[in-house]
Amino acid sequence: MTFPSSCAPLVGISRARLPAWALPDGWPTRANGEPLLADLAFRDGRIAALTPTDQPTPGLWDLAGALTLPGLVEPHAHLDKTFTIERCRPAQAGLLAAIHAMHEDRRHWTRADIQRRASAALARAAANGVTHLRSHVDWFTADAPDAWQEIARLDTVGITLERVALVPLPLFREPAQAEAIARTVANSGERCLLGGFIHSSNWDAAAMENLLCSAARWDLDLDLHIDEELSEVSQGLTWLADHLSRHPFPGHICCSHGCALAAGSDEQAAPILRQLAAHGVTLIALPMTNLLLQDATFGRTPRQRGITLLHEAQ
């Protein structure tokens, strides 16, 4: 690879190898069927032109055929919890034990500790090509935690950062408190979303109603930790699908985890997925987390994988 002077503005890159799905129809190929390399011209931070080439273009960064991909998107992170594994070891297996261990670690969560760990995580993400990151931030009361403000103050090193208030569902039980939480999130600046931890251990239909109503009133999008369990009695996604069929939500909803869909039959899951798709709900899977924590018991091999129904949700 060859690069112009570091003082020169980046106006484009030459001889980039793009994946086939990123090339326009009719892109020329070599005799062996391999697509030609590409010159990309930039203007105002966007790709202004895409030109087939096999020769380096003077004045552009010459990538000499290196693979070139769009910036990575991390749709589900927890910057407030990063780099805690060395001091946070669950005594039991499974999700709820992991949550308990993380709550025990909160005694270390000074503002300086949060800044140090979250900054390191963002820097590592940027170094690995992440350009957009959404971080959930645990709330433990109706008041915004220190991490909510500290993560807002981070140097984002070129990453577009979103914050989601991850609030336990019972905190939405009282309408006035639900309204206060939504108001705080809405007044926290750009790229803030309302979220909730929704599980059979804390299920409350009235709190769900208050959560969605308050988010709608304050023009907030939602990203919900919902049905993160392999339990056929979990009700979150079923309730949400039914609620949206009667009360469409004005913003966008993401549902993270959704493991419970894999615990029932395809016949049970299909109508739920159809209703969620009809309302534009996005389903986010977290395979590494769910493979580790779902159906987990010390001394027993997990029988179920814990990954939500991604193929069926397409």
Predicted regions and their residues:
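Divalent metal-coordination and catalytic microenvironments
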Residues: 40, 45, 65, 76, ...
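Alpha-helical scaffold segments that flank or form the walls of functional sites
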Residues: 85-136, 142-156, 180-186
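Active-site mouth loops of central-metabolism enzymes
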Residues: 101-116, 164-176, 197-202
